[in-house]
A protein has these predicted regions:
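Extended alpha-helical targeting/anchoring segments
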Residues: 1-217
């Protein structure tokens, strides 16, 4: 419940001895009939501060272009639009830049084809997506587990709403795991990237009663 206040539709899934509890602010994919949309997030500041700067804008634009390209693979030509671009929103205890990219699916596109074209979400891979995924697999020492995937509801008629599993806790074997991170580009400042990760983590850790300052040392 403490996490749900960050997003009313925060997804939760549990099984025998494990659970995934998400406070994700990011809509990975929504489908209603043949209308499909995604709302990528890039650019983060502490709550109350403005997100500004060339790096954030360039990174966000890159991801919007990637999402447009992904949706264009399964949508009617010319139907993909981005009616909302780099809007500033207060989400999950921080301030983000959010865009909305949407289109109209081609006749006959099913769930498998839609997910194959769009998964994983571009905001957690970077671009070009396939090359970035290969580099992530080479560089990261452990798997991401439940993090950076998608979780939500798929209905019998094909409609769906999936959150990107960022700001997500995984509980198993008596331990709780939370993954946070950020996009790294050529001119990234390592210290700033670490601080951005803590900016994302602090509200969630505080919500569940974790000793935030101890963990940050």
């Amino acid at each position: 419940m403490a996490l749900a206040r960050f997003r009313p539709l925060a997804p939760f899934l549990s099984g025998d001895g494990w659970a995934i509890a998400s406070a994700s602010p990011e809509l990975f994919l929504s489908r209603r009939g043949r209308r499909v949309r995604t709302m990528p997030i890039k650019g983060t500041r502490p709550l109350g501060e403005h997100v500004e700067g060339e790096k954030d804008e360039a990174e966000h634009t890159m991801i919007v272009d990637l999402e447009r390209n992904d949706l264009s693979r399964v949508c009617v030509p010319g139907s993909v639009r981005w009616p909302e671009l780099m809007a500033e929103r207060e989400l999950a205890g921080v301030t983000h830049l959010v865009s909305r990219v949407e289109g109209r699916l081609r006749e006959g596109v099913g769930l498998a084809e839609l997910l194959h074209a769009t998964f994983p979400g571009g905001s957690v891979t970077g671009a070009p997506k396939l090359a970035a995924l290969d580099e992530i697999a080479r560089l990261e020492p452990v798997g991401r587990g439940a993090s950076m995937g998608a979780l939500g509801v798929v209905r019998g008629n094909g409609d769906l709403e999936l959150a990107l599993t960022i700001r997500t806790f995984a509980v198993a074997a008596g331990r709780i795991h939370l993954w946070v991170g950020g996009g790294v580009v050529w001119d990234s400042d390592p210290d700033a990237e670490v601080e951005e990760s803590w900016t994302k983590a602090r509200p969630l850790l505080t919500a569940v009663g974790a000793p935030v300052e101890e963990l940050a040392r």
